[in-house]
Amino acid sequence: MATKKFRCKVCGHEGDKAPEKCPACQAPASEFEEIKEDTAPAKKGIDRNSNAYTIIYSAVMVILVAVGLAATSQALRPLQKQNEDNDKRQQILRSINVTVAANEAEAKYNELITDAFLIDENGQKVGDAAEAFAGEKAGYPVFVATVDGQTKYIMALNGAGLWGPLWGYISVNDDKNTVFGADFSHQGETPGLGSEIATPAFSQRFLGKKLFVDGVFKSIAIVKPGKSVEGQDYVDGISGGTITSQGVHKMLFDSLKSYEKFLTSNQ
């Protein structure tokens, strides 16, 4: 059993009992009070300097940030998809020599592109317009445009450059042989060198070139500036961008070869 303690309220003297007079200040016994000890355990606060607190705090913050980013991404996804689609429409339109702003791309695309479909290597249709534009289903997209009353066929190109993928679109007249226009894009080619394939100065070199010679598919060669090649049409490559130019050369042949049956059919 705990011993009682008493304290003088006048001078603070403590003792095991309340005397008639305080031995220190002579205050009467009425000035003594019993010292009450708090037996309840002290509540411990959070130790913000502990490793556990740091780990828990960091984990909570990471979760909150991740949730916030995910929510933002979901909210912005429709706008991102619209921007991606308009960029694709701009590329397709540039391949028929039509350049428009992003906010005008959808309207101009709907005006000029009269049909679209997917084909297989035999030139047979295997997908509709939506599938051709989405590019998610296996096959080769064809976009049919009407420009000044004349039919143009647009085909997709895919390849690899020095530092990353190359892609683009090339259009031909209704003879399915003569190039009407082209547009090329890249991811990461060297600025001022390989990146020049994305400029009109390069794509315009293809206008009027032929994909077939005497009925045989040849594609269009990319050669070093000043050089030539026999037996097929060719254009000058990019000075200082040899590997990128070779990538475009291979991309044209490999991609257009998949369209050969379509280009020689009566579709």
Predicted regions and their residues:
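The −1 position to Zn-ligating cysteines in a subset of zinc-ribbon hairpins
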Residues: 7, 21-24
